[in-house]
């Protein structure tokens, strides 16, 4: 089977189970922490792929990575099932699929604003309000500081990207000069 098919099946099952128990929000928060742990700590994935490590140790590692050892019963049972079925190498993809499914179900958009310096909270609130007005859903914003922009900002939401950075404008002017001088 393909990674995507397996991951999506397990993610749908986790979402249905969490919905049934009324803990989908808690599981979503824990899944976000776990996904972040997978990206920050490559050794976590290596430990899960290790066939010598017992399932109990892997369960403890995952619970620790998902919330300091205190995770919801639903996520814990899900991880136990994944370990029992020996599908732990797909766990990262299952968690990412769960996050995507949850966001679709709750109509949550993820936006990112990249600037040279920190953005005031009131500016982020105004942008969030505009996006909520257009999407009729909830918006999760991340802000990133990148000194290479030299000024301006880059705004991303879903597949839409607005690049109003000085670095991008300089790049466009440079391309126009090159095109005219050929």
Predicted segments with their positions:
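Elongated, mostly alpha-helical coiled-coil "stalk/stator" tethers of large membrane protein machines
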Residues: 1-182
């Amino acid at each position: 089977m393909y990674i995507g098919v397996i991951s999506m099946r397990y993610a749908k099952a986790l979402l249905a189970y969490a919905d049934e128990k009324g803990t989908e929000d808690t599981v979503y928060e824990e899944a976000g922490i776990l996904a972040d742990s997978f990206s920050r700590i490559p050794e976590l994935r290596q430990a899960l792929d290790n066939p010598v490590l017992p399932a109990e140790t892997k369960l403890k590692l995952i619970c620790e990575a998902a919330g300091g050892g205190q995770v919801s019963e639903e996520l814990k049972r899900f991880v136990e099932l994944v370990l029992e079925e020996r599908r732990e190498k797909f766990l990262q993809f299952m968690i990412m699929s769960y996050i995507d499914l949850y966001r679709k179900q709750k109509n949550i958009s993820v936006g990112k604003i990249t600037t040279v310096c920190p953005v005031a909270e009131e500016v982020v609130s105004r942008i969030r309000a505009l996006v909520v007005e257009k999407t009729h859903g909830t918006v999760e914003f991340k802000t990133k500081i990148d000194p290479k922009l030299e000024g301006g900002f880059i705004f991303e939401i879903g597949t839409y990207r607005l690049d109003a950075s000085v670095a991008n404008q300089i790049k466009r002017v440079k391309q126009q000069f090159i095109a005219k001088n050929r």
